[in-house]
């Protein structure tokens, strides 16, 4: 889900086309697909005269996925991942987007992929429609992010 000025402007929820061997790989594939949308929307904003100087923050609840996006070395556990998904690394290296750790229970997009308890659903819905501001700065904590 991509948000601009407090409201969701783009979202997608579907099964992935490939089989992932780990949650980190699945998150990395999703981040790559998100990166394509980020690149497209940044170009639209630039065409309208709103060029983005800072990287677009993409919130991720999987620390291994964040680490893979920042490290250009292919490791033993990630060497089987299709090269096309390393598009994320290019976007991060060129400062188009940045993966930012966020606690799992604060992921607004979870309402598109998971069955949530009513209080969480209401909280995420209110953020998604812009009723309540999303303040990631107070929610982010690299030391307390849980995977999955």
Label each residue range with its predicted role.
Residues 1-6:
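Acidic, metal-ligating active-site segments
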Residues 14-148:
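RNase H-like nuclease module associated with reverse transcription
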């Amino acid at each position: 889900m991509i948000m601009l000025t407090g409201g969701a402007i783009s979202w997608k929820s579907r099964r992935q086309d490939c089989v992932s061997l780990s949650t980190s790989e699945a998150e990395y594939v999703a981040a790559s697909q998100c990166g394509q949308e980020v690149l497209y929307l940044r170009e639209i904003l630039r065409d309208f005269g709103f060029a983005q100087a800072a990287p677009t923050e993409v919130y991720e609840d999987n620390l291994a996925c964040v680490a893979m996006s920042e490290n250009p070395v292919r490791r033993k556990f990630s060497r089987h991942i299709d090269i096309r998904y390393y598009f994320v690394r290019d976007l991060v290296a060129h400062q188009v987007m940045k993966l930012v750790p966020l606690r799992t229970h604060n992921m607004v997009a979870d309402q598109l992929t998971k069955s949530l308890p009513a209080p969480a659903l209401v909280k995420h819905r209110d953020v998604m429609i812009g009723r309540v501001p999303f303040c990631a700065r107070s929610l982010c904590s690299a030391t307390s992010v849980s995977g999955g």
